[in-house]
Amino acid sequence: MQTQPKVIMFTTPTCSFCNSAKRYLREKNIRFTEVDVSRDISAARDLQRRTGQTGVPVILINNRPIVGFDRPKINQMLNIRG
């Protein structure tokens, strides 16, 4: 049995790329934890410390960051075909 990777997505409510990324992961039945950095300042600081990024979305897959909604990289890291 393959364990599901740990996926955390840092977002804001007004980010259209965040909404697209969330929709994509849901379509692929990938469970993820969403962190709204506009409401959680400590999470925003943590995001910047971990990745050097202040923009969203940033998706952590098993603690490896993907900056932006980079579908090919998401597919590669989650072994999603097509």
Residue ranges and their predicted role:
Residues R31-A43:
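Thiol-based oxidoreductase modules, predominantly thioredoxin-like and allied folds used
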Residues T11, T33-D36, V67:
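A structural signal for short, well-ordered beta-strand elements
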Residues I74-G82:
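Thiol-/selenol-based redox modules, centered on thioredoxin-like
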Residues P57-V67:
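A short, hydrophobic beta-strand/beta-hairpin element that forms part of a small beta-sheet core
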Residues M1-K28:
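Local sequence-structure signature of Cys/Sec-based thiol-disulfide redox active-site neighborhoods
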Residues S16, S42, K73:
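Short alpha-helical
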